[in-house]
Amino acid sequence: MLNDVIAVTNRKLSQRPFLEQIKRVCHLRPEAIILREKDLSETEYAKLAEEVYNITTSYDVRLIIHTYINVARELGINTVHMSLHNMREYRKEFIDNVNKTNNI
């Protein structure tokens, strides 16, 4: 239904329980959801990401992780949204991963 929409989260703006809101958004079938909860530690984010991933997967909606590359890896997610500053910081790691993927 919303194939050209990428939803971006902010659980502080949700008027209903956050995971319930994620289900409602997934029901609308967006292209993807970016889990952009910038105030969480990586540990807190990982726990929430796993819960959200279980929901998005059941609706066949792609989940995009924000900033935390290790969380994306743990969940088997290959799309990460981040600032240009962070991208520059992880640049070598990205290049190495692309080279491994493409057998370069």
Give the label of every model feature segment.
Residues 1-89, 95-103:
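Conserved N-terminal beta1-alpha1 strand-loop-helix module at the mouth
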